[in-house]
Swiss-Prot record:
Residues 439-448, 465-476, 948-959, 969-978 have a biased composition (Polar residues). It comes from Dictyostelium discoideum (Social amoeba). Residues 412-438, 454-464, 493-520, 546-571, 901-913, 928-947 have a biased composition (Low complexity). One of its GO terms (molecular function) is protein serine kinase activity. Residues 333-396 form the SAM domain. This is Probable serine/threonine-protein kinase DDB_G0272092.
């Protein structure tokens, strides 16, 4: 037991200017005093921001040598949910020991967690009473000899008798720990020679002798001692009671020390990013104690600068800025800058080499072929990309004139007069021009959709001039990675190679207008998703423009300018080619075998419509497929999202993921995937005409978790980020497949900022995502936990309920998100649900993500619960409620039974806002057994009568089948909630 040094008396007096937590602008504050593992709290003072505690507010505690600080926390009492955090203050024991008389002070409240809203102060009265009793003399001569560093006495004792190395001193510290902390190398060596020396034992703080040795030792010749301690049982990554490893303790050495011991620990297998119970890494410790050389060494050896740790949680850079150490701030910032730069270039594998050799952005322009040789960078593609990027930093304009801007459009200029000299166009200011976005450093994208009409001499034939229109889209071979969402909105405009004269006016892309004094121009294009007719009359002195909207079926854009020259633009396809997609990281594609000729696709049924495109049921090579078509193929953000989804679906070949057949990139951007005939899990749960039994529950539930596990175990790891029952599809043979990877990301360094953004359907979003923390596998587990709750409720209650629908005051998704993240509100599991199932759901939905199970643990636990069900089927089945419409019915011939046909279901919901269409209901009978797994009805209707030919553009499809209507369904909760399909009307 730790030695007592005194006692402290703390009186919580009052607070002022506290943060309002209730809707009425008030709070119900109370205080909690924490000393070690002991807590005592005051009563709550109702409806005030200036509380005064006058009773039950005085507490006394004993203080021992191990206590570092006393904490006082303030909370807002809440009758119906968890209490809200209002702030805390930490008072060091060293400061408290100075308060030998009653001392009253105001203490400013700090946030308990980074995003907490905190204000105000709390007034405390503190007095410290020192313990005047002297420690008793050591009873053991062995302990006394160690503390006196008497090696001769110890050697005599070892020769005379067998010594007990586990004997402790008066404070409970074992003999071997006292020796390890003595900084006496001969003494420690002598003890370790004892064959019975047990060095794996722990002291009262959970430290091994290795913990104490690396903290107290000042000798550089200590490798033999470390080796012997490890050989005798000290684990290199063993944790003490605070979660500290030997590497953490080495950072706390009280004397100025080189990194020798730290180097030795890493060589022995110490985990450089190991986190304590407060999530601190060794890098955090080195920053806290201000050891610049340690920080430098950790950074050079792979320390993660994005890990948050401490209380409140901070990244290493945030911590360094808070402590105000300019040297450490500079080193951490340099590492972040070079890492971001290499990530944008998709060269993250080179980050360790650059950091190890301290090649940061301040010297990046000095890189040449010789530097790359010294760094042992031999891959030609990496060398080319690096040298190109370095040239762009030196001169951002140097590459713009050589850029090859792709386009599939031709501009045909028809001149009614005898114009054989294109220079007349320039004299009349008729040159078409648009800005080209720079792909310079830090800009993830170029602007797409703009094009420039360039008159070309020597192409005149029968008064026709053909000139090429060049589109502008980033090629990932030559510019930075677009995986980071934060890059999408960065735009750096530069002058094009042939800038417009100052007197000219350049219209905005994607519909450039030729401005001239005596010209008539007609432009036809399929670039824009919305079709318009533009009539423009312009002279050098006066320009007027009128715009009217044409019917959606008319896919042309006409621009009329008075009077004599006509320009026709042929429909422009996507500004993408094979190289744009083949160059993406992590994809498993050979050459261009994945490219699908859109002419081989047949569009049969419109399954759903979202903000960025549509999903069709169709055929490819005689096989039913789902075709996801991008609505706009010139919007740079849409194209970037298309690339991201393509990158995920083309890379994954897991059995629990919808199969990727290929993609079309010529006439339209589309992804062709496996068609799942039974639709989504959401629609299966929503179908209230069919029973959802425990067998269904366990069969689909285990498959769903297993499918998620296949994503998390992929290399590199995939995070779905939008997991919900609507994105779990079910095939004809009841196999669960995960779909909709529009928000999914690889868990790599290039996606760190993206993974910290709020994404997904709010009812399924984990609390940490709301607070801006990085999205992890445990965030996906939370979403799967909500899905498991959804299935549990449907199985027990017999009806489907959306998550949080039992709370009538939560009408909008943002209310759900705030309540779940800040109030710890969770969907209510049925009271009669089996206890094991309730516990599993609760574990997956716990606020602390580190306490949630992994997908493997989740899967294994559900299998155990399934075994429990199989052993107690009657008991489990007895708690289920079966509505009358789900009871077995006799076969009724020729009866039309409304149901959710598989073709009615959105096979790949590409957006939260989804328009669902359905097919004509078919004749079928109600099976005597309503079990879903025994329902063998053929859901694949013969759609031969409904086939339609491929549209010229995706937006011309308003009725994929003449007998089918698109029905937009709305809900009062939010547009991000799942849509409900309805039967088709003729």
């Amino acid at each position: 037991m730790a030695r007592k040094i005194g006692s402290v008396r703390i009186e919580v007096l009052e607070g002022r200017n506290l943060v309002p937590m209730d809707s009425n602008g008030m709070s119900d504050p109370y205080g909690v005093v924490i000393v070690g593992d002991k807590k005592k709290k005051t009563k709550a003072i109702k409806h005030t921001l200036f509380p005064k505690w006058e009773s039950d507010n005085c507490f006394e505690f004993d203080i021992d040598v191990n206590l570092l600080a006393i904490t006082v926390e303030v909370y807002d009492w809440d009758r119906f949910s968890s209490d809200d955090r209002m702030g805390l203050t930490n008072i060091p024991v060293s400061q408290i020991q100075e308060y030998i008389v009653d001392t009253t002070k105001w203490y400013t409240l700090q946030p308990m967690k980074p995003n907490d809203k905190v204000s105000g102060e709390i007034k405390l009265k503190i007095r410290f009473d020192k313990d005047k009793t002297l420690p008793p003399p050591e009873k053991s001569p062995f302990i006394k000899a160690i503390k006196d560093n008497d090696t001769q006495a110890i050697e005599l004792m070892m020769n005379k008798a067998k010594l007990d190395y586990t004997i402790c001193d008066n404070e409970g510290t074992p003999a071997i720990h006292i020796a390890a902390a003595s900084n006496n190398i001969p003494l420690i060596t002598m003890l370790l020679k004892g064959s019975d020396a047990r060095v794996s034992i722990r002291d009262q703080h959970g430290n091994t002798p290795l913990h104490l040795f690396v903290q107290k030792n000042v000798s550089l010749n200590c490798e033999d001692i470390i080796n012997k301690l490890i050989e005798r049982g000290c684990g290199i990554n063993d944790e003490n009671n605070l979660g500290e490893t030997a590497l953490h303790k080495a950072c706390l050495a009280t004397v100025v020390q080189k990194t020798t011991i730290v180097e030795q620990l890493l060589q022995k297998g110490a985990i450089i990013n190991h986190q304590t119970k407060t999530r601190d890494t060794p890098l955090h410790y080195a920053i806290k104690v201000g050891k610049v050389e340690f920080v430098r060494f950790f950074l050079q050896n792979g320390a993660n600068v994005m890990i948050e740790g401490g209380k409140p949680s901070r990244t290493p850079l945030e911590l360094a800025k808070e402590l105000g150490n300019p040297q450490i701030i500079s080193k951490v910032e340099k590492v972040i800058e070079i890492s971001d730069w290499l990530n944008e270039l998709q060269l993250e594998t080179l980050i360790p080499k650059f950091i190890k050799n301290e090649i940061y952005m301040d010297v990046i322009t000095d890189i040449n072929e010789g530097t790359l040789d010294l760094l042992n960078i031999s891959v030609s593609g990496q060398r080319t990309k690096l040298l190109r990027a370095v040239r762009k930093i030196k001169d951002p304009l140097s590459l713009s004139s050589n850029s090859s801007l792709r386009s599939n459009s031709l501009i045909h200029v028809e001149n009614d007069n005898n114009n054989n000299n294109n220079n007349n166009n320039n004299n009349n200011n008729s040159q078409e021009q648009c800005n080209i976005n720079n792909d310079s450093l830090g800009s993830g994208n170029r602007n797409s959709g703009g094009f420039k009409a360039q008159n070309q001499n020597n192409t005149l034939n029968n008064n026709n001039v053909e000139s090429k229109s060049t589109g502008n889209l980033n090629s990932l071979k030559n510019i930075h990675n677009v995986n980071n969402d934060n890059n999408e909105d960065k735009k750096n405009n530069i002058l094009s190679p042939n800038p417009i004269p100052a007197s000219s006016s350049a219209p905005a892309a994607p519909s450039p207008v030729a401005i001239g004094s005596n010209t008539t121009t007609t432009t036809t294009t399929a670039i824009a998703a919305t079709t318009t007719t533009l009539t423009t009359t312009a002279t050098t002195e006066d320009k007027t423009t009128t715009e009217s909207t044409t019917p959606p079926q008319q896919q042309q854009q006409t621009t009329t300018i008075t009077p004599t020259k006509t320009t026709t633009v042929t429909p422009e396809g996507p500004n993408l080619d094979v190289s744009d997609l083949s160059v993406l990281k992590h994809i498993n594609l050979d050459s261009d075998s994945w490219v699908i000729d859109e002419k081989t696709l047949t569009y049969n049924v419109l399954l759903g419509t979202g903000a960025s495109g549509k999903v069709y049921k169709g055929t490819f090579n005689g096989q039913e497929v789902a075709i996801k078509v991008l609505k706009s193929f010139t919007d740079k953000k849409d194209i970037a999202e298309f690339k991201k989804e393509f990158q995920i679906v083309s890379a994954l070949r897991a059995p629990g993921v919808v199969y990727f057949h290929g993609a079309g990139i010529k006439d339209k951007l589309c992804i062709v995937m496996e068609y799942c005939s039974r639709g989504s899990l959401y629609h299966i749960l929503k179908d209230d005409t069919t029973q959802f039994t425990w067998d269904n529950f366990f069969n689909l539930g285990t498959q769903a978790i297993n499918s998620l596990d296949s994503l998390h175990n992929w290399t590199p790891q995939v995070l779905h980020r939008d997991l919900k029952s609507l994105n779990l599809l079910v095939t004809e043979n009841w196999t669960v497949k995960i779909c909709d990877f529009g928000l999914s990301r690889f868990d790599t360094g290039s996606n760190l900022e993206t993974l910290g953004k709020l994404r997904g359907t709010y009812a399924y979003v984990a609390p940490e995502v709301y607070f801006g923390k990085k999205y992890t596998t445990k965030s996906d587990v939370y979403s799967m936990g909500i899905i498991l709750w959804e299935m549990t409720y449907r199985c027990i209650k017999g009806t489907h309920l959306l998550p949080y629908a039992e709370y009538p005051h939560l009408k909008f998704d943002y209310q759900i998100l705030i309540s779940s993240a800040k109030k710890d509100v969770r969907p209510t599991t049925p009271e009669n649900a089996p206890e094991s199932l309730k516990n599993l759901i609760a574990r997956t939905l716990v606020k602390d993500s580190t306490l949630r199970p992994t997908t493997l643990e989740f899967y294994e636990e559900l299998l155990k619960i399934r075994d429990e069900y199989n052993a107690n089927r009657e008991q489990w089945d007895s708690i289920r409620t079966i509505p009358p419409q789900q009871l077995p019915k006799p076969i009724i011939n020729e009866e039309i039974i409304p149901s959710i046909d598989s073709n009615n279901i959105n096979n790949n919901n590409n957006n939260n806002n989804t328009t669902v269409t359905s097919e004509k209901p078919k004749l079928r009978y109600q099976p005597s057994n309503s079990n879903l797994l025994n329902n063998n009805n053929n859901n694949n209707n013969n759609d031969s009568d409904n086939n339609i030919s491929e549209p010229a553009t995706t937006d011309s499809i308003t009725k994929p089948i003449s007998k089918v209507k698109e029905q937009l369904l709305t809900r009062t909760r939010s547009s991000s909630s799942p849509m409900e399909p309805k039967s088709i009307k003729k």
